[in-house]
């Protein structure tokens, strides 16, 4: 556990250096905490990492500066995320338009990959203690291919990194969404409206049974 916390400290420190050139606005005060006390700058939920993955059925995350609040991070240009993956589960391909992400494996084995703007694919399998970086705005994924649970921690270089899921954006966007002809043309298929509707329904159901990502 001590080694894990050292790695996490280094991870956060690295991302904090990156935020010096990030797009989040600079503070005009030392920090953004009303009536601060010492505990505002401490976060004690890492104690729960001694038994990562316990009882997890589907991948989920807890954003440290939101649930529970880590008010000491407010305005500092950082976000922190804890992931727990059920067996053979994944975080679907998505992007963070406003942040670079550094992912650290806490338990299990995680497949990680991204594609760059030249359509080159970079992928590897990560083990406990490994770190992988997802450059800002690039499409990426995380997957637990194992039969057991896995967990990891990410630090992002913006407190509001944004999340754009390819599948959710394509099939379940709010409002009118993408026209069926646009989707079928993009996928290179001669699909009837009913087939596209079936894909949309499948994605909508999947979004209902996974958690907030």
Tell me what each language-model feature is.
Residues 86-90, 96-118, 128:
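Glycine- and acidic-residue-biased ligand/ion/polar-headgroup-sensing regions
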Residues 91-94, 112-114, 124-125, 134, ...:
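Short beta-strand His + acidic residue motifs that chelate non-heme Fe in jelly-roll/DSBH
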Residues 78-81, 87, 101, 128-130, ...:
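Core residues of folded domains in eukaryotic genome-function proteins
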Residues 3-81, 189, 193-213:
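A short, N-terminal "cap"/entry segment at the start of jelly-roll beta-barrel domains
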Residues 31, 120, 124, 141-213:
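Double-stranded beta-helix
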Residues 73-75, 116-137:
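Short acidic-glycine-tyrosine-enriched beta hairpin
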Residues 69-72, 81, 92-94, 101, ...:
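Beta-strand elements of modular eukaryotic interaction domains
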Residues 73-77, 97, 147:
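A generic fold-level signal
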């Amino acid at each position: 556990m001590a080694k894990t916390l050292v790695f996490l400290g280094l991870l956060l420190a690295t991302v904090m250096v990156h935020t010096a050139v990030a797009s989040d606005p600079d503070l005009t005060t030392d920090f953004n905490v009303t009536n601060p006390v010492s505990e505002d700058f401490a976060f004690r939920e890492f104690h729960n990492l001694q038994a990562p993955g316990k009882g997890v059925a589907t991948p989920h995350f807890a954003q440290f500066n939101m649930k529970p609040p880590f008010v000491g991070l407010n305005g500092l240009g950082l976000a922190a995320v804890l992931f727990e993956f059920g067996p053979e589960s994944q975080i679907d391909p998505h992007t963070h338009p406003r942040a670079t992400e550094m992912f650290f494996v806490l338990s299990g084995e995680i497949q990680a990959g991204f594609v760059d703007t030249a359509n080159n694919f970079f992928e590897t399998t990560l083990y406990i203690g490994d770190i992988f970086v997802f450059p800002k705005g690039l499409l990426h994924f995380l997957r637990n291919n194992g039969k057991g649970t896995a967990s990891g921690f990410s630090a992002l270089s913006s407190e509001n990194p944004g999340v754009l899921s390819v599948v959710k954006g394509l099939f379940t966007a709010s409002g009118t969404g993408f026209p069926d002809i646009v989707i079928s043309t993009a996928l290179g298929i001669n699909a009837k409206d009913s087939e596209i509707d079936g894909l949309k329904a499948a994605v909508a159901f999947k979004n209902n049974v996974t958690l907030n990502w």
